[in-house]
Amino acid sequence: MKVLVINCGSSSLKYQLFDMTDESVLCKGLVERIGIEGSKLTHKVNGEKLVVEEPMKDHTEAINHVFDALLDEKYGVIKSLDEVSAIGHRVLHGGDKLTESCIIDDKVKDKIREFIKFGPLHNPANLMGIEACEKLAPGKKNIAVFDTAFHQTMPAKTFMYAIPYEYYEDYRLRKFGFHGTSHRYITLRTQQLLGKEDINIITVHLGNGSSIAAVKNGKCYDTSMGLTPLEGLLMGTRSGDLDPTVMTFLMNEKGYSADEMNQILNKKSGVLGVSGISSDFRDLEEEAEKGNDRAQLALDMFIERVKRYIGGYMAELGHVDAICFAGGIGENSSSMRKDILDTFEELGVKLDLEKNNTREEALISADDSKVKVYVVPTNEELMIARDTLELAK
């Protein structure tokens, strides 16, 4: 069985086609600048690539070009769309109503629309991708896999906000959490590595967007992101946790609207805002080595925030089997992992510095560490493909 996985952004689209007999990737690609001048599709297969530069005014035209690439005489990997058993879609926000992956129908689409208020950039784009596939491949099963789903096992004491309770009842204002597909993949893989299902672990997904989850007995117990992906850790451009009065002060002092304030906190803050240089952690490490104090400050603030969450989740869980690093930074930066965990020895977490020097899946803790530490490269697309295969049977 072949499964197509699609991840739609507001002006971009990523895709991968899987052969689920061995979970291999047959091809993958990216469509950029949808609805903007300079639309481009880059399709990769067997180390070769096909580049298509044509106007693509919407997601339907973009997905039509994706289908053409899949069927291309030279760069294609299928002879007919009939070979694709189902299409899996990453959907940002399912709220507390769509708590697991599901076959998409009109009711599901209505619920995705309902949560546009909490995912105004992503949910509309996710819907456009779904509706384009329904139009271009009628009769094909479309499956939704939600970023929020894994976290819906959190108890009320970890997902509620301490604001008047009627705001929760009237507007569902609560923590939902994100990167759930990644945290679920890491959890399932760590269950295999530890040889048991009832595991207590801390999953640390660090990239330009970052989040941490506390997993208790194999289920999400708490997570750092909140109602939206803005809460929690410092990120590339997101502020993370912040005294809300900072916002009201700036709105009063500078005359910012709520939308402008949202833009500042989501797009101009985080390590970019602190450093004034870049949202890319590699750039900051380079600048810090040259003696740039603000670059170093941004990195230090990021590390301290990660430490705070890991330490807090260790207290919440009581017993911790493992801490698992994933994401672009979590998987690739041995120095970041070392700096994050260098104060945890008293809590039973000890790195083996030689083993830590890796970018592959590995156990990187010392033999005498009470808590195991792993690098577990995440694979959200494969997780979506697996769910799609299961539901499409």
UniProtKB/Swiss-Prot annotation:
Where along this sequence does the record place binding of substrate?
A: R90
Q: Which is a Gene Ontology cellular component entry for this protein?
A: cytoplasm
Provide the residue positions that the database annotates as binding ATP: K14, H205, L206, G207, N208, G209, D280, F281, R282, G328, I329, G330, E331, N332
Its Enzyme Commission number(s) read 2.7.2.1
In terms of InterPro entries, this protein maps to: Ac/propionate_kinase, Aliphatic_acid_kin_short-chain, Aliphatic_acid_kinase_CS, ATPase_NBD
Protein origin, superkingdom: Bacteria
- Sum up the protein's function in the record's words: Catalyzes the formation of acetyl phosphate from acetate and ATP. Can also catalyze the reverse reaction.
| Name of the molecule in the record | Acetate kinase
Organism encoding this protein:
Finegoldia magna (strain ATCC 29328 / DSM 20472 / WAL 2508) (Peptostreptococcus magnus)
Gene that encodes the chain? ackA
